[in-house]
């Protein structure tokens, strides 16, 4: 059986510092550009908009009747009743509902786009158990028609993740769901990167079937631990180099490795973990693994058995991104209950999220949350709309590390807003108007705001 690479990294990198002699002019300080592909997104509309007479779900646990939302310069300026303000645009939303823009924390749009043909399958780099060096943003095709379909369902922000074949699948990217010709034109400015990890059946099946480690769950854990040991050594070598240079010495920089740049980003608290993990005991092990190497376990995705460890997730500050009713399709996805989301949500300081992992259900993520609310309320819970909306707005933003920017209709936050024709938790509801940073990006009643990707031109 193939073994994981031996831990010689620290010796090799440490040797690079042997040149820390104060002789000759000091070399330039080698710095790693942590954002070589920056966002080029910019707010497209600075006009002011007043939405009046709506039922407003703020995303912070409030439900306001006959309320107004005032947007100025792409930000939420005020939310309340009978606002006395003047605006460039006024919309009477009598009988309609207003919520924050919907956020999906688990999508593969652009990396597994439509049409689903082999040449477009760019989400899983199944060449090694550890491909932390790959960035899914380099696979994202902005012309995927799925982005427009998702926007029609109120999706304003989404995280694109690599697939779950590998122990470390690579970096995810958070996007603004706006029409653009490049990925960078959609990239959410300054949003933290994510690192996709995967527990359980997928990595051991993909590599074990070829008699390559990991072949078992214990092989999975060994692979994670070895990678974090090497990442810790890489981090130490660069910190020693930085300290030596700051002290006026003349060290040689360690050799750069983009795989370990990503893992170091996690250790430094700059990259957030997003962990494909179904079973309770495996989520618990991943929390312990994070403690062993002093990083945060982040968000657990799918989490079929999250209800079994809801207290542990809350105590660790981990979000759980869950499906309402998708389970039983493989053994590790067997032991779920329909109350999963609600049980996680019921614990103090919890972070329950409803996600899609689907190009279909992302179009109706409000209905996915609605399924949970209506089902559990028939079984003794008392979930209200103002609480359930958090699963696809504020809590989702928290999972992505952008809760200070979006996810609620709070003063000063980005004006990512959806006007619904009726209660968004009704199966009959439709997103009528969608705003991103205060700019109208979709209007069900105006074709000018119904974007069509270049790929779809002439096809409908």
Model-derived features: where do they sit?
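His/Asp/Glu-enriched, well-ordered alpha-helical/loop segment
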Residues: 39-40, 45, 114-115, 121-127, ...
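Divalent metal-coordination and catalytic microenvironments
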Residues: 54, 69, 74, 95, ...
């Amino acid at each position: 059986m193939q073994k994981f690479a031996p831990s010689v990294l620290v010796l090799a990198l440490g040797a690079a510092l042997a040149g820390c002699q104060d002789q000759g002019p000091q070399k330039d300080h080698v710095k790693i550009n942590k954002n070589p592909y920056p966002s080029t997104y910019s707010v497209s509309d600075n006009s002011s908009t007043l939405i009046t007479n709506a039922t407003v779900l703020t995303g912070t646990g409030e439900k306001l009747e006959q309320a107004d939302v005032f947007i100025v310069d792409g930000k939420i300026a005020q939310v309340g009743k009978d606002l006395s303000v003047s605006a460039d645009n006024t919309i009477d939303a009598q009988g309609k509902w207003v919520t924050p823009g919907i956020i999906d924390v688990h999508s593969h749009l652009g990396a597994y786009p439509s049409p689903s043909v082999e040449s477009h399958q760019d989400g899983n780099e199944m060449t090694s158990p550890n491909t932390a060096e790959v960035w899914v943003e380099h696979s994202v095709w902005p012309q995927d028609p799925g982005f427009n379909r998702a926007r029609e369902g109120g999706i304003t922000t989404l995280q694109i993740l690599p697939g779950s074949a590998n122990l470390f699948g690579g970096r995810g990217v958070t996007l603004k769901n706006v029409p653009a010709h490049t990925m960078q034109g959609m990239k959410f400015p300054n949003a933290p990167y994510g690192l996709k990890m995967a527990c359980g059946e997928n990595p051991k099946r993909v590599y074990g079937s070829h008699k390559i480690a990991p072949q078992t769950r214990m092989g999975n854990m060994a692979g994670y631990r070895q990678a974090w040991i090497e990442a810790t050594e890489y981090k130490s070598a660069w910190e020693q180099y930085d300290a030596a240079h700051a002290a006026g010495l003349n060290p040689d920089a360690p050799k750069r490795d983009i795989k370990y740049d990503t893992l170091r980003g996690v250790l430094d608290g700059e990259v957030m973990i997003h962990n494909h993990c179904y079973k309770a005991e495996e989520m618990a092990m991943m929390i312990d693994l994070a403690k062993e190497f002093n990083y945060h376990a982040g968000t657990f995705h799918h989490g079929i058995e999250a209800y079994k460890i809801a207290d542990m997730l809350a105590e660790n500050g981990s979000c759980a991104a869950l499906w309402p009713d998708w389970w039983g399709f493989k053994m590790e996805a067997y032991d779920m209950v329909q109350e999963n989301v609600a049980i996680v949500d019921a614990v103090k300081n919890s972070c329950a999220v409803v996600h899609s992992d689907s190009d279909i259900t992302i179009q109706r993520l409000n209905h996915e949350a609605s399924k949970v609310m209506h089902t559990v309320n028939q079984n003794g819970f008392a979930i209200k709309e103002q609480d359930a909306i958090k699963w696809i707005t504020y809590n989702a933003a928290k999972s992505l590390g952008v809760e200070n920017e979006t996810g609620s209709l709070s003063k000063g936050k980005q004006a990512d807003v959806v006007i619904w024709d009726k209660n968004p938790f009704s199966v009959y509801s439709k997103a009528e108007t969608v705003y991103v940073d205060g700019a109208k990006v979709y209007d069900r009643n105006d074709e000018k705001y119904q974007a069509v990707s270049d790929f779809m031109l002439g096809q409908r």
